[in-house]
Swiss-Prot record:
Belongs to the metallothionein superfamily. Type 15 family. The gene is MT1A. The lineage of its organism: Eukaryota, Viridiplantae, Streptophyta, Embryophyta, Tracheophyta. Keywords: Metal-binding, Metal-thiolate cluster. InterPro entries: Metalthion_15p (IPR000347). Metallothioneins have a high content of cysteine residues that bind various heavy metals. This is Metallothionein-like protein 1A. It comes from Vicia faba. It comes from the Eukaryota. One of its GO terms (molecular function) is metal ion binding.
Length: 77
């Protein structure tokens, strides 16, 4: 999964601060060239890995995703 701490301290990973609900659950749609998947997180550790596939991740509310070199792309915290 992708996560961003927006601004000059952008970071990718589980510490994403964008679009966090108070329940700790998050909703994401993941697209590759061949498939589209919906992922609901918060019930256990998220470990998603695609080999050799281009992937984009965006939350339901157009939050943030990490782009090249750990940039927030886009980020609406």
């Amino acid at each position: 999964m992708s996560g961003c701490g927006c601004g000059s301290s952008c970071n990718c990973g589980d510490s994403c601060k964008c679009n966090k609900r108070s329940s700790g659950l998050s909703y994401s749609e993941m697209e590759t060239k061949e498939t589209k998947e919906t992922v609901v997180l918060g019930f256990g550790p998220a470990k998603i890995h695609f080999d050799g596939a281009e992937m984009s991740v965006a939350s339901k509310e157009e939050g943030c995703k990490c782009g090249d070199k750990c940039t927030c792309d886009p980020c609406n915290c």
